[in-house]
Design a protein with these regions (language model features):
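Conserved C-terminal "lid"/linker of ANL adenylate-forming enzymes
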Residues: 237-240, 244-245, 277-310
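Conserved AMP-binding/adenylation subdomain of ANL enzymes
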Residues: 1-12, 19-84
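Residue-level signal for inorganic ion chemistry
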Residues: 60-63, 154, 192, 200, ...
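Gly/Ser/Thr-rich phosphate-binding loop
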Residues: 58-62, 70-140, 236
Length: 310
């Protein structure tokens, strides 16, 4: 909360996330207070666009799903003057989006940079108060969730990221068994797979509990495959899992992209299969997708807007 991110005093911060989430409470409210910001509360996601025009914020904290929605508005502008588009969507004063809670496609950093908007990615969990790492505007590395905060240190054990420091919880309230599983010798077992490069930048590759173990013993992170396929505009949401011994992808297609490509309902499966085939041609055998399911509704989500896997 006290990390100097070089935000000018009295920056206007529009809070659009649920206040009961640690991410919002820490980074919107406490961070906003510590940096002397003016904190404006968004009263409804349905009125977010109107409130952006009302409050004219400089900074907003979002989850990737929100950023992707705004990215579509920017992409729809085509070759229009970036300054005019930015003024229409955000206002010329807007300069920073802080992103956390899920994977963000790296190419979105380039899209928003075209409009002079920096996306600062971070990583954390409630058990760590919640921020573990963050990106700073003058030190961005695409694909990374930033560098560790000064009060955190990390190690990787069997592919799993473990952290310790002053922000790590003492334990789960009246849950000694769960605490013992998660905290071991002062280290918090995050359950996330990842690595730290030679410059101290943290990269995440998936969740340990989501790993798919193939018949020949290979480990496959479904998030890796999902993130690769989400680069395709026709795929709005995707869930990769093991089903009857093979890797299966369930896809919710993007309706607007279907219209743009002139695809009818009865041709969408064939179009998606072509995308899967294209991915499979480049993927090693153990990471190939052998089954495709198409759904006509969004996946059920958690309160933090992540797809429910189980």
């Amino acid at each position: 909360t006290c990390l100097d991110m070089k935000f000018p005093e009295r920056s206007v911060l529009l809070s659009v996330l649920p206040v009961h989430h640690a991410y919002c409470l820490s980074m919107d409210i406490l961070k906003g207070i510590s940096s002397g910001s003016v904190i404006c509360i968004n009263d409804s996601l349905f009125r977010m666009a109107a409130n952006i025009k009302l409050f004219r914020p400089n900074i907003m904290l979002m989850v990737p799903m929100m950023i992707e929605t705004l990215a579509k508005k920017l992409a729809a502008a085509g070759d229009k003057d970036p300054k005019m588009v930015k003024e229409a969507v955000f206002g010329e004063q807007f300069h920073t989006i802080c992103s956390g809670g899920a994977y963000l496609q790296p190419e979105l950093l380039d899209l928003f940079a075209k409009y002079d908007i920096a996306i600062l990615q971070g990583y954390g969990m409630t058990e760590c108060s919640p921020v573990i790492s963050t990106t700073l505007s003058w030190n961005i590395r695409k694909g990374s969730v930033g560098q560790l905060l000064p009060n955190c240190e990390a190690r990787v054990v069997d592919g799993e990221l473990q952290v310790r420091g002053s922000s790590v919880m003492q334990g789960y309230y009246q849950m000694p068994e769960e605490t013992a599983e998660t905290l071991q010798n002062g280290w918090l077992l995050t359950g996330d797979l990842g690595y730290v490069d030679e410059d101290g930048f943290l990269f995440l590759t998936g969740r340990k509990k989501n790993l798919i173990i193939t018949k020949n013993g290979e480990n496959v992170s479904p998030e890796e495959l999902e993130n690769k396929l989400l680069e395709q505009p026709l795929i709005r949401e995707i869930l990769v899992r093991e089903a009857e011994g093979v890797i299966e992808a369930e896809v919710f297609p993007d309706e607007e992209e279907m219209k743009a490509q002139g695809l009818a309902e009865n041709s969408i499966t064939e179009a998606l299969q072509k995308l899967i085939d294209g991915y499979n041609e480049q993927a090693p055998a153990y990471k190939r997708i052998y089954r495709l399911k198409v759904r006509n509704t969004e996946f059920p989500k958690t309160p933090s807007k992540k797809i429910k896997r189980y």
